[in-house]
Amino acid sequence: MSEINSQKYKKLFQTVCEAPIDAPKEAFNLHDWVFTLSDKDYQTTARGHIGAGSSIHTDGTQTSVNVESVGGNLLVQHYVAEVKEPDYVKMVSMSDLWLMKLVHVVVKVTWEMRLISVSDSECKFQNTVLVEHPNFIMKIMSALALGGYFVRKHNEEETPLFAENLYKRTFKENT
């Protein structure tokens, strides 16, 4: 186990955003959607999305690799799903982060997506991003660099576009 994995993490920031979907949550499968999201679709869901792909390790573990720029910082995320349900996916990544594209650090990013029933014919897509690091200095650096602000703005941009993509892909494939 690497040194960073054995340390206690401190929350740098967390953001939760929601977007309405005009269909019941039972119509969707978040796990299938996120692991079949094409590179092109990923790029259309936020200005900072550079590329994405998924693969399967030799041990059978499914992974999703996302490359994005948030607030001038470059992230390469190596997500592994911890929970894979049709209406809830939780993925964790030990992400490579280049602060201002210069200083390399590794942060733990937890990405959770949920579908929450609103009525028999509607649900909402909830997108949660949690960024953690074991060193308190990173919390100070993140605050000084307005990291929480930029991650929140990024989440506000991508959440409705993820919901729209989920809806379009689900109903296009089912027709």
Where are these regions (language model features)?
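Hydrophobic ligand-binding cavity/cleft-lining segments
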Residues: M1-T63
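Residues at beta-strand starts and edge strands
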Residues: K11-T15, F28, T61, V89, ...
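Short, surface-exposed coil-to-beta transition loops
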Residues: Q14-V16, L74-H78, V106-E112
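A short, structured loop/turn motif at beta-sheet edges
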Residues: A23-F28, E82-Y88, R114-K124
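Glycine-rich portal/gate segments that line the openings of hydrophobic small-molecule binding cavities
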Residues: I50-L102, R169
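Beta-strand/loop substructures that line and gate deep hydrophobic ligand-binding cavities in soluble
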Residues: W98-E157
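Short, highly charged C-terminal tails/helix-capping segments
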Residues: P160-T175
